[in-house]
Amino acid sequence: MSFRGSRDPAPWLVAAALALLITVPAANGATGQRLDLGVGLTTAYDSNLLQYSNAQIDQFESGSHPDRFSIETRDDLAWSPELSLAWELDSGRGRRHLVRVRGSGEFHQKDATADFRAVSLTWRESFRGGRRLTLAAYALPSFYLRQLFDPDAVPAFSGLSRYRRAQFGLDIASASYRQALPGPLEIEAGYQYERRRYVAGFRERDSGTHQAELAVGVSKARAALEGRALYRDANAKAEDGDGTAGDDVDVGYHGPGGGITGRIEFARRGRMRLAGDLALEGERRRFDSNRALDTFHRDRTDVRFAVESGLRIRLVRRAQARAFWRYETNDARLGARASASNDAGSYREHRVGLAFDATLTLWRPAAAAGGSSEE
């Protein structure tokens, strides 16, 4: 997914970070404090940047409908930088406090129209006994979806296109609680709320999405395995406010999902670590629309599947690199009323890349700086 931000990325996150720093108890002269700077850079090739269907790819490559596309090429090379600032306090006896602010983005070699920026805030409280509470917020000011048909648009001249740039702002708030169980088992429960607000012309697509998630994992020193199950319920506005009832699309949906993630360490020598990971994801979405004119969403069911594998190497303690490959597919099954020539909504996407990240301690009390700690 990609987006382009043009306004200040959620200053409320900065205010919240300052409030958390004041709220979290910090002992005077505590030697367990530190301030870390994290940097990262990912470069990746994407075979289907905006997840177009086969019908849309044919239209784009033929040049028969240039008004329906704002990209130069359907595949592209993307650069994704990341910068974070994290404050951590170790109070002893298993109590840890963490506040992290992170900024990230994605910038494309040819398709600058799909560039994006985002900011996030994380507050984590760890307790003895392997308990952990995490609160997080994420702000994406402007996400470019694609060109969509605007039935309410009035072109200045006859024959001009009614396709418009569809983009939205996305805000996410989440909470999760992780608990260690007897042996190597861990369990985590989480909740997430997403709010999408589209630009004028596509207000009927505004939505709020609830997501509940449960995960169970097994963690060893050199291997880990985790399974997740989730359920999503997206409620769309489905009205654009023009006073005409029933003529707008309803993009609301509901359905289950989940996945399995595994990690294993192949080799270690000194500070060097070599590890591999594999993740499988699946999701089923049943659209809620019951409108006669909304043939693209009425009685529609989507089935999405993704697989990702990676190879990670760490040469120094706080720097590492990861090569990865990801394949994602979506099978959109439309209702009987949909036109045979309608865009099927299915897509196939490959993504392969290389990611680097490193962490540098900017500050810690003198007493702690002289000691050593395991990262």
List each language-model region with its residue ranges:
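Outer-membrane beta-barrel "beta-signal"
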Residues: 230, 346-375
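Transmembrane beta-strands of outer-membrane beta-barrel pores
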Residues: 41-49, 89, 103-109, 137-145, ...
